[in-house]
Amino acid sequence: MPPHRPRIGILTGGGDCPGLNAVIRAATKAAERLGYEMLGFLRGFEGLAEPVAYEPLTPRSTANILLQGGTILGSTNKGRFSALVGAGDRRQIDPELLEQAARTLRELSVTGLVCVGGDGSLAIAQQLHEHGLPVVGVPKTIDNDLGGTAFTFGFDSAVACATDALDRLHTTAASHERIMVLEVMGRHAGWIALHAGIAGGGDVILLPEIPWTFEEVCAKVVERDAAGKRFTLVVVAEGAHLPDGRLVHDGGQGEQRQVRLGGIGEIVAREIATRLGREARAIVLGHLQRGGTPTAFDRVLASQFGAHAVHLVHEGRFGQMVRYRPPHIESVPIADAIRTLSQVDPASSAVQAARALGIGFGDAPAAASPYAHPGPRPGPPHCPPRDRML
């Protein structure tokens, strides 16, 4: 019986998002063309340890998953594998688990493992790499807050979902002269809120990176009223701090020790209603932003990531993460990528353009001059340590 071809493994860790299946499909097709068999490990990193769980992947079995949301391999953001990311807050994975994973790859003749995930999943991948496993990373987060890459797939789809919600809220807000507050995802970074707020015609955008006050938010509503616009759309990232610096959470915990954020939209709506005597409603998109069909941009980006990851394995360039550095797909050490947080720059062209359009960010008028050149800025305000786990 002839020996089987060399194998490449792939897994998806952390929260799901549109585009994961596009990565799996692209990696499988690229591996086939280079003479590899593809194995998909199930339920994230859990599939590497006892009981080992995997299934063969072929171009035929992955032929129809390009437009499918979620991940055919399953995923988990809990379990035995976990690695916190942050200053002095990195959890070491049990050495026995690391050895189980290494043994699994050896016994299955897997020459390289493609790990698709966010900062927490890539922190796990880095520990596997440090243990000697042949690992390559693919970045995934709808928040777009992972350092080392200009964009991650899933982000554009999440923005499209939030933009569609704003389009729909616009008509009902205008009809009933209401203030509508849309809460979107964005734990440490306001990328979704910023892009959706611009694309969906928002009037106020509240971000983790820009301090704001209720007085300025209400002033924007009053300004619109005076101009004959008796409705206002407010977009707020779930990680936007209250004016006193506090984060709003729902009292529970999400992934292991991570505090689950949520509720800032309701607080903003209630405060506006109290201060102005106007009707204000809050809407939370939540996991709707993670589901559904990926946009064309996300399909293209995910496909490029998957193909490039396989080529990194083929070239033996382990410990690297693929990244998008327009216009090229490149790679960067995983350790470097998970060390930095990508946040919205308050002086960026996108923020300046939004201000020029009349969009408010809840900050003082002196800080709201579009296309100003304030000189060097300190780091983003309220920048928390990287304590997320995916």
Q: For each predicted feature, which ranges?
A:
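A cross-family phosphate/adenosyl-ligand binding-site feature
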Residues: 1-13, 21-109, 116, 120, ...
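Short beta-strand segments
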Residues: 11-12, 41-42, 74-75, 115-117, ...
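A glycine- and small-aliphatic-rich helix-loop capping segment at beta-alpha/alpha-beta transitions
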Residues: 25-34, 54-61, 127-137, 153-157, ...
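Short, acidic/small-residue loops that bind anionic groups at enzyme active sites
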Residues: 35, 39-42, 128-152, 156-159, ...
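Accessory alpha-helical/coil subdomains and C-terminal extensions
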Residues: 104, 115-117, 123-127, 134, ...
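Glycine- and acidic-rich phosphate- and metal-coordinating loops
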Residues: 281-289
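Flexible loop/turn connectors
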Residues: 302-314
